[in-house]
Amino acid sequence: MIDQTAIIHDTAIVHESAVIGKGVEIGPFSVIGAEVEIGDNTWVGSHVVIKGPAKLGRGNKIFQHTSIGEDCQDKKYAGERTFLEIGDNNVFRENCTVHRGTIQDQSLTKVGSGNLFMVNVHVAHDCIIGDNCIFANNATLAGHVVIGDFVIFGGLSAIHQFGRVGSHAFIGGCAALNKDVPPYVMAAGNYAKPFGVNSEGLRRRGFSAEAISAVKRAYKEIFRSGKTVEEVLPVLTEMAATEPAVQLYVDFLKDNERGIIRA
């Protein structure tokens, strides 16, 4: 179903089962496949391919030569029915790729809202991405990666499959992540190491001086006390009782399986 207010270029191909919302624009030579739903006021540039099953929310902008919802690159994939969900107001610049999930996980790749994917960013199968993240040019996410909210990835950075990055973390350019990066942490290098708290990012997002100070104290417990994750969790849990910002650390470390980056 195509809403009557949608503007579709004569050279674009839209499958009869696709659902195209109000005010959507689809540019020249783009291909919208079966079981694709595109939310209101989304702009699709030229030479874009969107393959279903995939659901895109409102107000997204997808630039030329981007591929959304393609089959994954996992060699185990055998054509199973898997899915992609994308929220609202994301920007995908030129040549981005976002693949659907696999049955070995939850059969779903999921992207939140308000994210910016710069040129040549790759999001592999089964990734889960939160809201308001920035991925600079050529950032690469392997399969099954989980990214929190307000995370920034520098250009040419990459993360190993099943890796996690907590909310408000900052990943430097060309970083290679082979372990999890806890919330608030600045990480850089190959392999990446921690370089303190993303204080400037927290200030820009309205964190109080007291909250940032608590985050820094918790950071020192995690990375400078010599304690293991298991040993530091009770300390952080006690801190979180009076400092709510520390709870992000607690929740993240409770789910730690691959280990975290270390200096």
UniProtKB/Swiss-Prot annotation:
User: GO: which molecular function terms?
Assistant: acyl-[acyl-carrier-protein]-UDP-N-acetylglucosamine O-acyltransferase activity
Give the family per the record.
Belongs to the transferase hexapeptide repeat family. LpxA subfamily.
Q: In which pathway does it act?
A: Glycolipid biosynthesis; lipid IV(A) biosynthesis; lipid IV(A) from (3R)-3-hydroxytetradecanoyl-[acyl-carrier-protein] and UDP-N-acetyl-alpha-D-glucosamine: step 1/6
* E.C. code: 2.3.1.129
Task: List the catalysed reactions.
Answer: a (3R)-hydroxyacyl-[ACP] + UDP-N-acetyl-alpha-D-glucosamine = a UDP-3-O-[(3R)-3-hydroxyacyl]-N-acetyl-alpha-D-glucosamine + holo-[ACP]
Q: Where in the cell is it found?
A: Cytoplasm
Q: What is the first-listed, main subcellular location in coarse terms?
A: cytoplasm
| Assembly with partners or alone | Homotrimer.
Q: PANTHER family attached here? A: ACYL-[ACYL-CARRIER-PROTEIN]--UDP-N-ACETYLGLUCOSAMINE O-ACYLTRANSFERASE (PTHR43480), ACYL-[ACYL-CARRIER-PROTEIN]--UDP-N-ACETYLGLUCOSAMINE O-ACYLTRANSFERASE, MITOCHONDRIAL-RELATED (PTHR43480:SF1)
Gene Ontology CC = cytoplasm; membrane
For this UniProt record, give its keywords in alphabetical order, as a comma-separated list.
Answer: Acyltransferase, Cytoplasm, Lipid A biosynthesis, Lipid biosynthesis, Lipid metabolism, Repeat, Transferase
Q: Name one GO biological process term.
A: lipid A biosynthetic process
Please state what class of enzyme this protein is: transferase
The species is Aeromonas salmonicida (strain A449)
- Enumerate the SUPFAM superfamilies for this protein: Trimeric LpxA-like enzymes
Top-level taxon in the UniProt lineage: Bacteria
Please identify the protein, giving its name as recorded: Acyl-[acyl-carrier-protein]--UDP-N-acetylglucosamine O-acyltransferase
For this protein, the record's Pfam families field holds: Acetyltransf_11, Hexapep
Q: What does this protein do?
A: Involved in the biosynthesis of lipid A, a phosphorylated glycolipid that anchors the lipopolysaccharide to the outer membrane of the cell.
Q: Which HAMAP family match?
A: LpxA
